[in-house]
Amino acid sequence: LNSLSLPVDVDYAVMINANELIGHNGGTNNAVELIFSEKKNSPIDIVRIATHVGDIKKCQFIAKSLQKLGYRVFLNLMQIDSIDKSTLSYIVKQVQSWSCIEVFYFADSFGNMNTDSISDTVIAIKNEWDSDIGIHAHDNKGHALVNSISAVDFGVSYVDATILGMGRGAGNTKMETLLVEIAGLNLGEYYPDALFPLALQDFNELQKKYNWGSSIYYYLSAVHGIHPTYIQAM
């Protein structure tokens, strides 16, 4: 990243898979040190830790280590719809006690959530969380945009999106359409038209090449709670 001419006044973020650091042969601490230098030597501002519920406790060490290096730290809890709300509240309370996580993200990993489950999830998090909340939606059932906008209505501050929904399997919330909706709701000063040429030209070609996006297979994977990697393997 240091070799790139990056725009200034932009916060740059990366996401790491907690499971890979926890399972590193040299230990979790060594894994963190191998990947990250001190913030003062890096263009990265934010590190987001993606984790499953079973690894939450082990993420505290990773989060504290990254904070000591000078990074802002977010947590991304995956497969949120498979966690009952009492367990979710307990997890959020634990993470709150760490005092080092700036934003608590939840991921609709199977793309099978709806506005009701989004609402229930946000309420469960808010009951134990004093800071910002984020959502990472998947578009298996075509609900990513609606779920993202609903999450904002329910009080979520951070919404993930990519151009043309670029992402694994069915993809994620489409940035160009999300910005149109947000601008229409007067939630900020955005200019979605500026993205249209990039989406229609460069990213359209990338989508044809890498073939991400909705299909009946990904829809059915959401219906039956099957991880999208199994569909990709098919």
Q: Where does each model-flagged region fall?
A:
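Catalytic cores and adjacent flexible loops of soluble metabolic enzymes
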Residues: 1-234
